[in-house]
């Protein structure tokens, strides 16, 4: 009989790391497109285009690296990486509503070849933990 030990908490998964906007935006955009293109509307296509354009704009990336709590692009979040390839993503989009800090968890995506392993669940949990640690009054999915 064989068994596998799974970490009890999401933060114990070595494949999970924080999104690095300086290098991950194009790959995350590709993953989102792969996972959602059959149902993506014009707003979604525009969002992907904005992500890709932002990833090529050095001035924006330098600015955004310090503004992760105030913009709607996914400048913070978590990715799942295997063999130096991003195969999962959960973006965190912070905003304020009547002075309250709120996080939207968006673009939870897992590459089709890596599904049914709990990657999306673990990334979502990590994103929720992040929002909780930032004292968010609400988390929306």
Describe the predicted segments one by one.
Residues 1-34, 38:
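Conserved N-terminal entry element of GNAT/NAT acetyltransferase domains
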Residues 47-49, 69, 104-107, 129:
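Basic, Lys/Arg-rich alpha-helical nucleic-acid-recognition elements, primarily the DNA-binding modules
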Residues 114, 118-126:
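Conserved acetyl-CoA pyrophosphate-binding loop and the N-cap/start of the following alpha-helix
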Residues 75-79, 85-94, 104, 109:
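Conserved beta-strand in the GNAT
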Residues 32-86:
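Active-site rim helix/loop that mediates acceptor-substrate recognition in acyltransferases
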Residues 131-141:
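Conserved GNAT acetyl-CoA-binding A-motif
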């Amino acid at each position: 009989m064989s068994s596998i030990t799974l970490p009890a908490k999401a933060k114990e998964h070595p494949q999970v790391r924080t999104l690095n906007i300086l290098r991950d935006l194009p790959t995350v955009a590709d993953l989102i497109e792969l996972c959602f293109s059959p149902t993506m509307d014009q707003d979604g296509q525009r969002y992907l285009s904005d992500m890709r354009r932002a990833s090529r704009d050095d001035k924006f990336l330098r600015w955004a690296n310090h503004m992760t709590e105030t913009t709607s692009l996914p400048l913070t979040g978590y990715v799942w990486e295997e063999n130096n390839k991003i195969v999962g993503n959960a973006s965190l989009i912070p905003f304020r509503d009547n002075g309250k800090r709120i996080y939207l968890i968006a673009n939870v995506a897992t590459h089709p070849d890596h599904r049914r392993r709990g990657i999306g669940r673990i990334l979502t949990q990590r994103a929720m933990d992040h929002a909780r640690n930032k004292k968010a009054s609400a988390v929306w999915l």
